[in-house]
C-alpha cells in the first residue's frame, strides 16, 4: 500500500460508489467479527468440540476486526476527534431508539411476533440510555469537565488503584506514574 497515493484517493472518495462499498465492507466485516466471537464462545461451551476450534473463530474474528478498521479508516471516520466520535455515537444511538427499533418492533408485531417486538422495544430503551451517556460525555469533553469537576470527587487510577479526593484528577498517578487519562471518578455500586 502506498500511503501517499491512498491519502490522495481518500480526498476524492466522498459521494462515490466506492465510498458506499467501503461502508458496506465495514458493516460486513464488523458483523463477521461479532458473529465469529459469538461462535467461539459457543464452541468453548461444547464439550464435544476442540478448544482449537474456538481459538480459530477468535483468531478469524480478530482478522475481521482488522479488515473493518481498514475500511473505516479509509472513509475517514477514524481521523475525527473523540468529540466527533462521541457525537457520531450519540447520533447512531438516537437513530436506533427513535427510528430503527420502533419500526422493526411494529413490523414484528404486525407479523405476529409479539415477543420479538417486546425485545426490540426494550433494546430501544437501552439505546436511549446509550445516547444520553454519550451526550453527557460529549458535554464533559466540550466543557473541559472530563478530569475536572465543580465539587470534590474520589478519583481512581485504573492501573494501580490509587485514589484521591479532589476537584481534579492528578496529571500523573503519584504511585504508578500513569497519565491522567487513566483516572476516572470512583463509583461503588455494590
Predicted feature locations:
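Non-heme di-metal
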Residues: 2-190
